[in-house]
Amino acid sequence: MWFENFVFKTFKYHLSLISIMSIFRAYDVRGIYPDELDEELAYKIGRAFVTFLNSEEFKNGLEKQGFSKTFLNVKQVVVSQDMRTSGKSLKASLIKGITDQGADVIAIDGFCSTPKHYFAAYSLKAPASIMVTASHNPGQYNGFKFTRDNAIAISGDTGIKDIEKLVIENKFEDVSSKGKIIKKDVTDDYKKYLLKFIEPSKVRPMKIVIDAGNGTGGRELELVLDKLPLDVIKMYFEPDGTFPNHEANPLLDENVVDIKKKILEENADFGIAPDGDADRVFFFDENGERISGDFMTALIAEKMLEKNPGAKIIYDLRSSWVTAEYIKKAGGIPIMWRVGHAFIKDKMREIDAILGGEVSCHFYMKDNFNTDSGIIAALRVIQIFSEKNKKVSDIIKPLKKYSASGEINSKVEDKEAKMKELASKYKDGNISWLDGVRIDFEDWWFNVRPSNTEPLLRLNLEAKSKELMEEKRDEVLNLIRD
């Protein structure tokens, strides 16, 4: 019997480890509550976070990256949460873990978007922060996003793996005194900050539809909307982590049915849909057609380059050729980079770029401490569309120069071998291994990237004609799926 109990306990322990390891990802911690992420684990993560920030490993990592070590011996962490139903209890357990490890916590009052959290962390000069959110994931998920000083993201390569290791080891040193909790409301300061990104006098009367998806973005846009001459049709502005109307992920077609319909019903000029934690935002023209994130990167870049001629703009390698063309035409220097917020933010700081944009509708801005904000992007785009004083579809039309496949997933067990096979097949093209494999030819290109969490390869392909795009899309897919 003792052997059976031993085997059962060992099996249960290994299952627990597998569950823990599955939630520590490339950019954040994210899992299903409470099966994968619960209060006990949140407490351990709080202790592990403070332990890591004060470790020699972190100090050495900073030295290698060329950063200052002066903020070590971290004694203060900003913690915020979005509207998810599990957020309150996870936040409380996380805070207890942080304070039990000797650091003070500045707890931001109320529901908070990720952009507002970044603002709080940066403006309060916090040496570190944690945002409790699962971004655009369904309601049963929750998670944590980590930053160090200046709201700089901590990724898998710069700390999340170390935090995971500490959680698994579960051996934390006792501290002489516990930290305290300081509650803080930054809403008034945040409102003043947001108004820096739009000039109300340059916004003409327009009718717009905003679907907040019961996330945090609607309430935060309301801080500024009353200053603008807009007729705003508000949809699902009440924060509700059960997402009673649809998931707060506007990337999926089923979640934008309502806003598309409302735009047409109201004869609106355009539509705006932030995701759950408002780090992303999606735009729709007067016909209810969703506008690709790379097109919006081009338009925002064009506007920002007016005051920053010759500046560098980062765009992700899934973007249309037209993105770089638009940036060059506007007097900027386009820089292609890999997908992922931590990678783009790091690159922006490295090359002093003023803007980074992803096809997935993340927009990162130097004047917003190199972080992504769906709120600020929305304000900038409202002014852009207003100043152009044309139908939004007419503004976007010149950007639809090429034909794109969209992202297509294929199940592949040996992802690395398949990408090498593609590189060999298309060796006459210009090959880049920046993020997966991207191969450019004169009249078409494709990128194949591996999923971080699943046995999937993701294909994006573009060509100078629809016929060529369809031909090459089918050709490459057949090779991937063979």
What are the language-model segments listed below?
Residues 142-266:
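Gly/Ser/Thr-enriched, mixed-charge loops and adjacent short helices
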Residues 127-135, 139-141, 263-285, 290, ...:
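Glycine-rich phosphate-binding loop
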Residues 17-96, 100-101, 183-206:
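An N-terminal, well-structured beta->alpha segment
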Residues 306-482:
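Phosphate-binding and adjacent anionic-ligand microenvironments
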Residues 66-67, 71, 76-142, 195, ...:
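N-terminal small/polar loop signature for handling phosphorylated ligands or for N-terminal nucleophile
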Residues 109, 161-192, 196, 286-359, ...:
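Proline/glycine-rich low-complexity loops and linkers
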